[in-house]
UniProtKB/Swiss-Prot annotation:
GO terms for biological process: arachidonate secretion; lipid catabolic process; negative regulation of T cell proliferation; phospholipid metabolic process. The active site is at residues 63, 105. Pfam families: Phospholip_A2_1 (PF00068). SMART domains: PA2c. Ca(2+) binds at residues 43, 45, 47, 64. It is an enzyme of class 3 (hydrolase). It catalyses: a 1,2-diacyl-sn-glycero-3-phosphocholine + H2O = a 1-acyl-sn-glycero-3-phosphocholine + a fatty acid + H(+). Its EC number is 3.1.1.4. This is Phospholipase A2 EC1. The keyword Acyltransferase does not apply. Its cofactor is Ca(2+). Residues 1-16 form the signal peptide.
Amino acid sequence: MRTLWIVAVWLMSVEGNLYQFGKMIKNKTGKPAMFSYSAYGCYCGWGGQGKPQDASDRCCFVHDCCYTRVNDCSPKMTSYSYSFENRDIICGDDDSCRKAVCECDREAAICLGENVNTYDEKYRFYSSSHCVEETEQC
């Protein structure tokens, strides 16, 4: 029964914001978000500390800062409406929380796409034990 509950919770999160954000990342970078960015550098993935390791990691740092600003909107779980039009991401929600979360994800996906050339395999599955420098402020 516990396993069934865990799978149900995971499926709910997959249908929410993180899944949508992953689709945006794939659209802008051509890389699968789960395998390429879920544990990249010091900031891509859950949590974050230390100094961003490259421009791609800095995109995730800025995204974390954006999520901090919209924290009352439960950004990791809030789903929203958006579309792709000629490779542009259009956030289309009238709800202010959903729109704000979508904009955080949109800006991060664009940033990752613009900096895909900085992506370095050595930062994939990067241990947080390497992220010891003083954490920057948002």
